[in-house]
Amino acid sequence: MPTKCVLDTNVILSAVLSYSGYPAKIFDAVADKSIKIYISEEIVSEYKDVLSREYFKISKDKVGRTINIIRKLGIMIVHEISDFPMKDESDRIFFDAAQSAETWLVTGNVKHYPKKDFIITPAGFCRNFNI
């Protein structure tokens, strides 16, 4: 049974910008279906917005392919909106999705989130699940 998680945008962005490193390993595991990701319309919209920013110089084609993979392989959920204090409100969608799905939140910005056992770095996630 595949491991399940929510991926913060920084993990997706890092995977798209570099084919090496823990974020790339995680995205490869999503593509080969050994990891399932939970997504929502808000999360997919955030991914697309960030990947499309001009200064990252990611082609529209690559953004489209990435979003298509995420939509095709992701588990679409509708999550509750919490009132948990957040350092950055734009991170709430990922926190709330992980809480609602009762799964891991994988992020390179652990410090942006409340201290919770389900929040983990890409390196920690890869070590814990032998990715």
Write out the residue ranges for each language-model feature.
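Intrinsically disordered, low-complexity and often Lys/Arg-enriched segments
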Residues: 1-3
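PIN/NYN-family metal-dependent endoribonuclease catalytic core
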Residues: 6-7, 17, 22-52
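Membrane interface segments of multi-pass transport proteins and intramembrane proteases
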Residues: 56-57
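A secondary-structure boundary/capping signal
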Residues: 7-9, 39-40, 109, 121
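Residues at secondary-structure transition points
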Residues: 21, 38, 61, 85-92, ...
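Active-site neighborhoods of divalent-metal-dependent phosphate/nucleic-acid chemistry enzymes
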Residues: 71-108
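Acidic, PIN/NYN-like endoribonuclease modules and their adjacent C-terminal/linker elements
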Residues: 92, 103-104, 110-131
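Short, well-structured alpha-helical segments
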Residues: 60-71
